[in-house]
UniProtKB/Swiss-Prot annotation:
One of its GO terms (cellular component) is toxin-antitoxin complex. GO terms for molecular function: nucleotide binding; RNA nuclease activity. Probable toxic component of a putative type VII toxin-antitoxin (TA) system, probably an RNase. Probably neutralized by antitoxin MJ1215 or MJ1217. Neutralization may be due to AMPylation by antitoxin. The active site is at residues 76, 81. It comes from Methanocaldococcus jannaschii (strain ATCC 43067 / DSM 2661 / JAL-1 / JCM 10045 / NBRC 100440) (Methanococcus jannaschii). This is Putative RNase MJ1216. Homodimer, probably forms a complex with antitoxin MJ1215 or MJ1217.
Length: 121
């Protein structure tokens, strides 16, 4: 399998963040907690985001220290390894309140990287 470049991982992160935002749009916690399909979908998206974040090189993570890379990766680890103890309130709060803001930061990273690509032509 060919090696993926950083932009591919960043676009994966954005795609799964968009999915989370769309899955939980116009939804309250009570509806979320009672909808097994949405809960599982959001958890899976967070797992993929966390895995993709681990592929972001150290120099980029250091350039954007305000982005919670470590926390996103850590959440993935907790979700993967604590399947009987998932804290759905934390999942909900992350999905509803944190992901939309963090997504903006990842969009900035992509814009910065794509700007560098254009300047190097």
């Amino acid at each position: 399998m060919p090696k993926r470049d950083i932009k591919a991982f960043l676009y994966d992160i954005l795609e799964y963040m968009d999915d989370i935002i769309n899955f939980t749009k116009n939804m309250e916690y009570e509806e979320f907690i009672n909808n097994k399909a949405i809960k599982y979908a959001v958890v899976r998206c967070l797992e993929v985001i966390g895995e993709a974040v681990k592929k972001i090189p150290k120099d980029i993570r250091e350039k954007y220290p305000h982005i919670p890379f470590k926390e996103l990766a850590g959440m993935r680890d907790k979700l993967i390894h604590q399947y009987f103890g998932v804290d759905y309130l934390t999942v909900w709060e992350t999905a509803k309140y944190e992901i939309p803001e963090i997504k903006k930061e990842f969009e900035k990273i992509i814009k910065d990287i794509e700007g560098k690509d254009e300047n190097s032509l």
